[in-house]
Amino acid sequence: MVLSSQLSVGMFISTKDGLYKVVSVSKVSGSKGDTFIKVALQAAGSDVVVERNFKAGQEVKEAQFEPRNLEYLYLEEDNYLFLDLGNYEKIYIPKEIMKENAMFLKAGVTISALVHEGIVFSMELPHFLELMVSKTDFPGDSLSLSGGAKKALLETGVEVLVPPFVEIGDVIKVDTRTCEYIQRV
């Protein structure tokens, strides 16, 4: 437990309504001299933000997370199936949590995840992945538009700009944060 006055941006709290990430915190003085802590909270697994007021000094339950390494296995309906490398249990992550990160997933990719009571709250891909080029533009098709680069479709369906010398079948390193070509492997 933490006091409401100790809440800070980035903390996770657990309430009777669910799990939340603290997005903003401000101290508000009431008309009768009492102080409240006004907090904007983002609901777990969604983009919904709600505002809550806590009395100054009120105890709030801080959510405890376990960092886990998960290996991607395959997509099953609307969930991505992962293997927890710590205890070898299967963990399902809904598409809503994966969002744009899903475009980099291929079997065997290991991600870092924060787990609370068996549920994945957030995840992070490795910063760099090596992916095979499955299709490219002809060098002349896109050179004039992109300053010497051409479009390449990778094995996971991601499209990136690559130098003209990259060909189908090449394995390239991609920055998953910016979706940019780094080098040919």
From Swiss-Prot:
It comes from the Bacteria. GO terms for molecular function: translation elongation factor activity. One of its GO terms (biological process) is peptide biosynthetic process. Its main location: cytoplasm. Pathway: Protein biosynthesis; polypeptide chain elongation. Signal peptide: none annotated. GO terms for cellular component: cytoplasm. Keywords: Cytoplasm, Elongation factor, Protein biosynthesis. Pfam families: EFP (PF01132), EFP_N (PF08207), Elong-fact-P_C (PF09285). It is found in: Cytoplasm. Transmembrane segments: none annotated. HAMAP family: EF_P. Belongs to the elongation factor P family. Involved in peptide bond synthesis. Stimulates efficient translation and peptide-bond synthesis on native or reconstituted 70S ribosomes in vitro. Probably functions indirectly by altering the affinity of the ribosome for aminoacyl-tRNA, thus increasing their reactivity as acceptors for peptidyl transferase. This is Elongation factor P 1. It comes from Chlamydia muridarum (strain MoPn / Nigg). The gene is efp1.
